[in-house]
Amino acid sequence: MKAIIHLTLLALLSVNTATNQGNSADAVTTTETATSGPTVAAADTTETNFPETASTTANTPSFPTATSPAPPIISTHSSSTIPTPAPPIISTHSSSTIPIPTAADSESTTNVNSLATSDIITASSPNDGLITMVPSETQSNNEMSPTTEDNQSSGPPTGTALLETSTLNSTGPSNPCQDDPCADNSLCVKLHNTSFCLCLEGYYYNSSTCKKGKVFPGKISVTVSETFDPEEKHSMAYQDLHSEITSLFKDVFGTSVYGQTVILTVSTSLSPRSEMRADDKFVNVTIVTILAETTSDNEKTVTEKINKAIRSSSSNFLNYDLTLRCDYYGCNQTADDCLNGLACDCKSDLQRPNPQSPFCVASSLKCPDACNAQHKQCLIKKSGGAPECACVPGYQEDANGNCQKCAFGYSGLDCKDKFQLILTIVGTIAGIVILSMIIALIVTARSNNKTKHIEEENLIDEDFQNLKLRSTGFTNLGAEGSVFPKVRITASRDSQMQNPYSRHSSMPRPDY
């Protein structure tokens, strides 16, 4: 046992000597040397918690080691030794040497619960500026435990660390245009997960270059699913539509002639085919096809080739309609079909915004300069018409050209709004009707009250007369309220009531 302790002390002395030599140098240079035999791991009186496996051996491949020699060190921790293929790492912060085990090769017989793999962490120390390669242990449960130079078995390394793994996730960018893949001052247009390069008008992108070509505008009808949204230009469905149209034109004209197809607008419409399914619809796609400048195709041949390809295939395309190139640029028809958009003459109602633009657009709306009088402003009275100087709403121009306020009941532009007048008339009539109804209600109520008072007076009078008759002493009052009592007399039997109508002599006879 004493012999082992003496050997350990000798090893520590040699380590201190190597450490002093390393501190005098400015940098540590590493070279690759082949290690043929295993090195016995050892530790000083400060124990380091490293995984150990008793009575295990492993074949060790060669690893890069430091230039300073490292003698074998006998472990005093236990009776078993741990063979390690890696050379010991000499620390510049303490007097102990920490052997770090690494992974064994395919012939290793080490237990599966022991060390599995080993990655290399490059750590830089802020104190001495030295860089050391420290192997970090990887347990079987995929937990990383990097080793530092301060005799610690876990925790993050000091300084800047770079971890190198064998598997790298090389996923592409989420935005295809973020790396600016388009050259020659072209624009990168993003779709869903792909993109294409767009050049100036009349040019197409080919081999990282914008080349001049012939422009053939038109419209093509394509069958799409019911859920297709033409506004979602970054959707997968829109990307498929762009790819389908591009493939059609590339197959029709060939790669030597075909340049590029640009989608301008996409509009939805009802399907003209009755045999289509209910969940299908078609869209009208306004496109511009650019062919090589040396092509012999014209507008007629281009239309014929495309429609022929549509009829002969069972694709989702319905038909292709040509748009004249001169109409596309807004120019008058020329003999060369407006091949040079900059040289064509604009139509009468259009103008070129600048000499470098091939398109003729509608003239800008400009108000007359003299429209600065009182109660006047620049207005567009007709849809699509030119602006003109007119009176503001509520005023009307007189014979002298001055703006006068509208008459009562009129308002709006040029005093054509009669709403106020109509409202006044209707309100007046409604007021009269309501007032008449109120008066009639009052009269009716007073009439009912007057009739009720007359009946009460008649009842009072009858009661008064009955009381007056009772005071005379007559017991046989007259019938039906008569003040004269009836007297019964006996009439003679011989005398008969004479009917006045029976005396014909005294009565004139009727003449009928």
Swiss-Prot record:
Question: Glycosylation annotated at which residues?
Answer: N151, N169, N193, N206, N284, N332
Cytoplasmic topological segments: 443-512
Boundaries of every SEA domain copy: 212-336
Query: What tissue specificity is annotated for this entry?
Result: Highly expressed in epithelial tissues, particularly those of the gastrointestinal and respiratory tracts, such as large intestine and trachea, followed by kidney, small intestine, appendix and stomach.
Q: Which GO terms describe its molecular function?
A: protein homodimerization activity
**Disulfide bridge partners, by residue number:** C177-C188, C182-C197, C199-C210, C326-C338, C331-C344, C346-C360, C367-C378, C371-C389, C391-C403
Q: Where is the signal peptide?
A: 1-18
UniProt cross-references to Pfam families, sorted A to Z: SEA (PF01390)
Q: Do the record's keywords include Chaperone?
A: no
The UniProt regions of compositional bias labelled Polar residues, in chain numbering, are 22-38, 135-176, 493-505
Disordered as annotated region, ranges: 22-67, 133-176, 493-512
Q: Which SUPFAM superfamilies match?
A: Growth factor receptor domain
> Is the keyword Transcription regulation in the record?
no
Residue ranges with Low complexity bias:
53-67
Q: Which residues lie on this side of the membrane: Extracellular?
A: 19-421
Q: InterPro entries, per this entry?
A: EGF-like_dom, Growth_fac_rcpt_cys_sf, SEA_dom
Provide the alphabetized UniProt keywords. Answer: Cell membrane, Disulfide bond, EGF-like domain, Glycoprotein, Membrane, Repeat, Secreted, Signal, Transmembrane, Transmembrane helix
Residues passing through the membrane, by range: 422-442
Mind telling me how this protein is modified after translation?
Cleaved into two subunits, alpha and beta, probably between the first EGF domain and the SEA domain. Beta subunit contains the cytoplasmic tail and alpha subunit the extracellular tail. The homooligomerization into dimers is dependent on intrachain disulfide bonds.
Give the quaternary structure: Homodimer of beta subunits.
Query: What's its job?
Result: Epithelial and hemopoietic transmembrane mucin that may play a role in cell signaling.
Protein name listed in UniProt: Mucin-13
Give the encoding gene's name: MUC13
